[in-house]
Amino acid sequence: KNEQINKWEILDKWVEKYKEIDPDLLVTSSHATEKNLEMPFTVGNLKPRGGRLYADFMTPEFLDGTAHPRVYFAAGNCLIGNIDNDPESMAVAWLSGMDATSMIGYVVTTWYGRNGWGGLKYWVANAGRLTLAQAVYLNQQDMLRTENEWHPKMLTVNYPFSEIEFGQREMFEKQFKTVTGQQ
């Protein structure tokens, strides 16, 4: 059954399905920070408090952990894996209160997500043959191989994520173009 859900109801539906299914694997992709996961963008929020996650409804609804192993794969969520010395972070809540035994999440902003989605692809496509860590590692090796095929000197560039975020993107682009012979 293909049914359209109003964006204001997506978080409600997610919480309902989370409780109903008690999943072994959770995969998310939406805007996130160290302090929240928006589902969808700008509307519904999951937030951490006291090492647990709650749905930020009019009356906050805390989510329960699980009694079985759980993997949380934040394949397309910026910053959600960044603990930043804060026990009130999303990563701490997923690993403690939500009982994720493994978690993959970005500690930088991302708009492409090859590391997350590629790692998930390697893990799922090789189900039972690779550990989660091996799948992520092989994906990273594949990304390096691809960069080397595009232009070997790409591997010599330092990708300064924090500087790019703080308005120094032009400096990075100039360095990148110089190294790859585009300037």
Please provide the spans of the model-predicted regions.
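Catalytic-core segments of thiol-dependent peptidases
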Residues: K1-E88
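Active-site-proximal C-terminal subdomain of hydrolase catalytic domains
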Residues: V71, A75-Q183
